[in-house]
From Swiss-Prot:
It comes from Acinetobacter baylyi (strain ATCC 33305 / BD413 / ADP1). GO terms for biological process: nitrogen utilization; uracil catabolic process. It catalyses: (Z)-3-aminoacrylate + H2O + H(+) = 3-oxopropanoate + NH4(+). Pfam families: Ribonuc_L-PSP (PF01042). Its EC number is 3.5.-.-. The gene is rutC. One of its GO terms (cellular component) is cytosol. GO terms for molecular function: deaminase activity. NCBIfam families: RutC. This is 3-aminoacrylate deaminase RutC. The keyword Lipid metabolism does not apply. Involved in pyrimidine catabolism. Catalyzes the deamination of 3-aminoacrylate to malonic semialdehyde, a reaction that can also occur spontaneously. RutC may facilitate the reaction and modulate the metabolic fitness, rather than catalyzing essential functions. Keywords: Hydrolase. InterPro entries: RutC, RutC-like_sf, YjgF/YER057c/UK114.
Length: 126
């Protein structure tokens, strides 16, 4: 099965040996996306809602480069630093997935960047 590497312009360079996304058999696998700028610095420090919006906009951009959109997302893996941010994250998440929401799970973890409050990995069928 051939796979296509998705490397959209404007996304921060990976922090380790991985790519932002791969596409195989019309399925796009988006790596865990952190709220980072083009220099890999965390944006919107302390603001879970703004970080969530930034992450979802980055995923939207990646999917667009793969020929898809957020409507094609079938599963999201959500990692958050603090459960206290869960309501703010859900409020923004609901704006991006108002109907036909994808399956998901959400777990509390330590994230690779200390100021990051959220990370999302996605799977989409395009």
């Amino acid at each position: 099965m051939p796979k296509e590497i998705i490397l959209p312009e404007g996304t921060p360079p990976p922090l380790a040996p991985y790519v932002p996304a791969t596409k195989a058999d019309n399925i796009v696998y988006v790596s865990g996306i952190l709220p980072l700028d083009e220099n890999n610095d965390v944006v919107h420090v302390g603001d879970a809602a703004a970080q969530t919006r930034h992450v979802l906009e980055t995923i939207k951009h990646i999917l667009s480069n793969a020929g898809g959109s957020l409507k094609d997302v079938t599963f999201n893996h959500i990692f958050l630093r603090d459960w206290a941010d869960y309501p703010a994250i859900n409020q923004v998440y609901a704006e991006y997935f108002p109907e036909e929401r994808p399956a998901r799970y959400c777990v509390q973890v330590g994230l690779v960047k200390p100021d990051a409050l959220i990370e999302i990995a996605s799977v989409a069928h395009v």
